């Protein structure tokens, strides 16, 4: 294994082929992250990230004169990017699943999109607040109808409704 510091320095000086040597050094790590992810394009995402990482690498810092610090920096950066991409992929998968469920219920696309946006907006509310807002805005029920359905007073429904709207406003 050649000196990683020198390889990065040469790459920054214009020796483009050095990036391939650097990628080869970290190929086992990229393969490990690929195996540990259910996202098919994880290796290519991390490879592209690594290009950007090497382009912006702070070689002028004294601590990066030794390979062990460079390797640790690249490893931690790749690991953080791996976590970020995995979380994003899981969120997309979750939305795809929700969309599939809603699609089965014969909703048109505009309704589907507004439902997904609505669910994203109310995600931080309590379950009771979410339930009441869904009944009011998605199902078109009045507060009195909701109160009869939930066996609570209309004032309690109104209070929960206003509290939820206030939370969303802030």
Swiss-Prot record:
Region (Sigma-70 factor domain-4): 122-169
Gene null: resulting phenotype: Cells lacking tcsR grow normally but display reduced toxin production.
Keywords assigned by UniProt, alphabetized: DNA-binding, Sigma factor, Transcription, Transcription regulation
Molecular function GO terms recorded: DNA binding; sigma factor activity
Domain of life: Bacteria
Cysteine pairs bridged by disulfides in the record: none
One BP term from GO: DNA-templated transcription initiation
Keyword set includes DNA-binding: yes
The entry's DNA-binding region: 143-162
CDD domains (alphabetical): Sigma70_r4
Family assignment from sequence similarity: Belongs to the sigma-70 factor family.
Its job: Sigma factors are initiation factors that promote the attachment of RNA polymerase to specific initiation sites and are then released. Transcriptional regulator specifically required to activate expression of the toxin gene locus, composed of tcsL and tcdE/utxA.
Protein name, entry field: RNA polymerase sigma factor TcsR
Gene that this sequence comes from: tcsR
């Amino acid at each position: 294994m050649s000196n990683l510091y020198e390889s990065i320095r040469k790459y920054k000086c214009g020796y483009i082929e050095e990036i391939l040597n650097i990628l080869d050094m970290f190929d086992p790590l990229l393969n490990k992250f690929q195996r540990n992810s259910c996202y098919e394009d994880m290796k290519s995402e991390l490879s592209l990230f690594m290009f950007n990482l090497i382009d912006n690498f702070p070689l002028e810092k004294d601590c990066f004169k030794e390979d062990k610090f460079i390797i640790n920096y690249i490893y931690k950066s790749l690991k953080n990017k791996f976590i970020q991409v995995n979380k994003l992929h899981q969120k997309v998968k979750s939305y795809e699943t929700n969309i599939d469920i809603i699609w089965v219920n014969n909703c048109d696309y505009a309704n589907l999109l507004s439902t997904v946006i609505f669910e994203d907006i109310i995600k931080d509310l309590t379950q009771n607040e979410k339930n009441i807002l869904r009944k009011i805005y998605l199902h078109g029920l009045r507060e009195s109808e909701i109160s009869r359905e939930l066996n609570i007073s209309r004032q309690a429904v109104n209070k929960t409704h206003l509290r939820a709207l206030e939370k969303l406003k802030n």
